[in-house]
Amino acid sequence: MAPAKNQENINQKLALVIKSGKYTLGYKSTIKSLRQGKAKLIIIAANTPVLRKSELEYYAMLSKTKVYYFQGGNNELGTAVGKLFRVGVVTVLDAGDSDILTTLA
């Protein structure tokens, strides 16, 4: 029961970031924001391909950005951010009113 409750909590925090903060969706924009040093946190879906995931981890390590591995796949991550399409990676640029940066990392 605890993992489901934790997942709901993360989804709520993510929804608050979408509402009040700044974020980007997708691989290309994530790499761009990591290279510019603007990213605070990246959230990677569970079914992201291994090569793409390792490249994101590498850029996150270079820019000293926190990485969170979302428990669900890209369909669930897309639903969590309120989109009707699949999302493999979400980059949090500014958390807004959410405390996602302190709780996830």
Curated annotation (Swiss-Prot):
Top-level taxon: Eukaryota
Spell out the molecular function terms from Gene Ontology.
Answer: pre-mRNA 5'-splice site binding; RNA binding; structural constituent of ribosome
Q: Name one GO biological process term.
A: negative regulation of mRNA splicing, via spliceosome
InterPro entries hit by this protein: Ribosomal_eL30-like, Ribosomal_eL30-like_sf, Ribosomal_eL30_CS, Ribosomal_eL8/eL30/eS12/Gad45
What are its GO cellular component terms? cytosolic large ribosomal subunit
Which keywords does this Swiss-Prot/TrEMBL entry list? Ribonucleoprotein, Ribosomal protein
Annotated SUPFAM superfamilies: L30e-like (SSF55315)
Know the name of this protein?
Large ribosomal subunit protein eL30
Q: Which organism is it from?
A: Eremothecium gossypii (strain ATCC 10895 / CBS 109.51 / FGSC 9923 / NRRL Y-1056)
